[in-house]
Amino acid sequence: MNKFDSIRPYTDNEVNEVLLDLSNNRRFLKMLFANGEYSYLRLLPFSRKILGFILRNKVKSIHDVQSYQNFFESIVNSVVENSIKNFTVNGIENLNPNTGYLFVSNHRDITLDSALLNLTLHKNNLGTTNNAVGNNLLSEKWASDLMRLNKSFIIDRSDKSKREIYQSLNLASEFIWDSISNKNESVWIAQKQGRSKDGNDFT
């Protein structure tokens, strides 16, 4: 057992099984009915079974993290095209594809902050990042599964003793160090705990 198992992203050999579990998760399906392109299905008889069947067909060929991220990329591209007037990137040519980096950014949206960075990296043939996410955002297992499929690792922000807080933060620090120094994988973290809700997100 790896000491990072409780916080690490899912690995390639876990991806398909997790996706199939999600296609049978009542709470996840309920979320899809309430939001997005499948909302019309909720009016049909056996709607949950129908949606589960659709999802299983979509994910049956996804067996690794890269394939999942390719699937996810089209969603992020759509967000950029439909909601951002001007998206520019500078300095990407200075990154070495064989080196892991620590990316620290301001924080407005836990999904899009890292997604926009990773879209840029992917389009420039660079490896995507492991992304830090607080467990306070992952009370539902399906939410945790989605984030860990997309290379997120968990920062434990539960109310604990000072000793337990130190241990959990130390484990996260070790994971970050191992990713960058030993595996040459990059990591994204927000510059502070909690996103800025007033637009004032300067360091």
Describe these PLM feature segments:
Residues 72, 81-203:
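Soluble catalytic domains of membrane acyltransferases
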Residues 1-101, 107-118, 122, 144, ...:
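Membrane-anchoring hydrophobic helices of lipid-metabolizing enzymes
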